[in-house]
UniProtKB/Swiss-Prot annotation:
Belongs to the TACO1 family. The lineage of its organism: Bacteria, Pseudomonadati, Pseudomonadota, Gammaproteobacteria, Lysobacterales. Transmembrane segments: none annotated. Signal peptide: none annotated. Keywords: Cytoplasm, DNA-binding, Transcription, Transcription regulation. GO terms for molecular function: DNA binding. This is Probable transcriptional regulatory protein Smlt3713.
Length: 243
């Protein structure tokens, strides 16, 4: 029986993953600051990106440098936003949001991932209509359902979803109201375990067996691309996809 990865190898892999997460968030901060100004209090999108950085222990100095590069106070790289849409095996719809300084490279990488995993890229709008853009505040199992529901309604949330299998709770908002609802919930003593603006599918497609493995391979491959910020799908993967 062979030995597993050494402690040093595991640490290096963890550091590489952390570095990739930091790179993606720094790009997101930069694009948000360039588009709406460098003050998070007056730029909701920047506020969300900064909060995302702080949640993974990104230092305030790193965040500040990213903002200054975007606003021209420091020299930096310009990134553009691109969205690709397509289908994974089994008719699963996929949205891929990218930030890139080289559109040709990015589209080639994304197309390669779709092709390699049995999917295909579509045209703009080919799958986006199957999703809604939402703000989601997630609370782990054990959270006080009654108190969170009351606070969410008071804060102006659009919906509260309680998952019966484990009791976890999602508070759903519009993208525009996301920051205000998040702040109001926190002020009431309910800090979400995870908070993001995301796409959610109107209806999920359950995939199992070999198809589920192919879909997961594609989603993982896309998420590993340096230029890809977020990947969304309407797949409900069976347990065998994680075997």
């Amino acid at each position: 029986m062979g030995r597993g990865p050494s402690i040093e190898a595991r640490k290096n892999a963890s550091d590489a993953k952390r570095g990739k997460i930091f790179t993606k968030i720094i790009r997101e901060i930069g694009v948000a600051a360039r588009g709406g100004g460098g003050d998070p209090n007056n730029n909701p999108r920047l506020r969300v990106a900064v909060d995302k950085g702080l949640a993974v222990n990104m230092s305030k100095d790193v965040i500040e440098r990213a903002i200054k590069k975007a606003t021209g106070e420091l020299e930096g790289v310009d990134y553009e936003e691109i969205r690709y849409e397509g289908y994974a095996p089994g008719g699963v719809a996929v949205i891929v949001d990218c930030l890139t300084d080289n559109r040709v490279r990015t589209v080639a990488d994304v197309r390669h991932a779709f092709s390699k995993c049995g999917g295909n890229m579509g045209t703009e709008g080919s799958v986006a209509f199957m999703f809604k853009r939402l703000g989601v505040l997630s609370f782990a199992p054990g959270a006080d359902e009654e108190a969170i529901t009351e606070a969410a309604i008071e804060a102006g949330a659009d919906d509260i979803v309680v998952y019966p299998d484990d009791g976890s709770i999602d508070v759903v908002t519009s993208p525009d109201a996301f920051s205000a609802v998040k702040d109001a919930m926190a002020a009431a003593g309910h800090v979400a375990d995870h908070a993001e603006i995301t796409f959610r599918a109107d209806n999920d497609i359950k995939v199992e067996g070999e198809v589920a493995l192919q879909v997961k391979k594609l989603l993982d491959m896309l998420e590993d691309l340096d230029d890809v910020q977020d990947v969304y799908s309407n797949a409900e993967l069976g347990a065998d996809a994680y075997a």
